[in-house]
Amino acid sequence: MKIIDSHLHVWSNDTNKYPLNPERPTLPEGNATAEFLLECLDEAGVAGTLIVQPIVYGFDHKYVTECLHKWPDRFVGMCLINPKDPNAPAELERLVKEEGYRGVRVNPGLFPQGVSLDSDISDRIFEKAEELNIAIGFLINPEHFDAVDALMTRHPEVQVIIDHFGRCKAEDISANSPFQKLLSMARHPKLHIKISGFPVASSPKAEGVGERSEQDWPYRDVQPMVKQLIEIYGARRLMWGTDFPFIVRQCGYTRGLTLLSQETPGISPEDMEWLLSKTVEKVFGDFGTE
């Protein structure tokens, strides 16, 4: 079975060649180079990945772009848009047409102070994404679900992905929980969910990225969320991701795969194939050979 990791980040240890985002002047702990990632992929039998532009570089895509060009058979890219830049749609077009990015990430935490995610800034991003025929990925909290709901109602032809279970927590999937709101948004046929970031979704709430220990694996309290998402969205609208490099110190890269592929019972072989590769290729195109 072909396996594609739909969500991870890479960065270099060389901060002179690849300067850091001034607002994030320190690299997170751990090795996140593309070379180390490839070692992890080969060990786990993962064919390719969607690299999401990391916040450590802000809107400077130099390192990720070099990785995409150097290993085009393994990597596909999702760029990060600057919602404060009035020329952001033009820059998005350049990144897609000249550098080969196949999607764009939107982070409401980067919007101008006091400006809602449900605003004309997002409308312009949606319009450009539809023109370019690319997907939009959202890093959001449950408080932003209503905004994404409204945007998708206005722009129903755009493929949208919500990362990391929408940052819902396994400890509360009751009738009035944010997770139930996420399930209700399945009425948008082009909305997809990344089943990524298992350790952070797991209960009790993680005390920052990477705080869940290896002993917590395989995060069985997250499994009911996965099963409800499959039931409501269908596996064809879900995609698995590790959130490398953070997964490495949370439980190890290979275990970040097997927690779904081997440790989550009741998923049919056909559904598993969609979760592990077919959905992400449906949205982003081919990721090279198996």
Model-derived segments and their meaning:
Residues M1-R124, K128-L132, R220, L260:
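Mid-domain alpha/beta scaffold segments of enzyme catalytic cores
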Residues M1-S6, P25-G48, K227-Q228, I232-M239, ...:
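Mid-to-C-terminal alpha-helical segments outside catalytic/metal-binding sites
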Residues H9, P54-I55, L80-K84, N107-G109, ...:
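Active-site beta-loop-alpha junctions enriched in small/polar residues
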Residues S12-D14, G58-H61, Q113-G114, K169-A170, ...:
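Short catalytic/ligand-binding loop motif for oxyanion handling, primarily in non-cytosolic enzymes
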Residues N13-P19, K62, A90-E91, I173-A175, ...:
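Short aromatic-enriched loop/helix-cap "lid" or pocket-rim segments at secondary-structure transitions
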Residues V64, V148-L151, G256, L260:
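Hydrophobic packing residues within well-ordered alpha-helices of enzyme cores
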Residues S116-M239:
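Catalytic pocket-lining loop regions of alpha/beta-barrel enzymes
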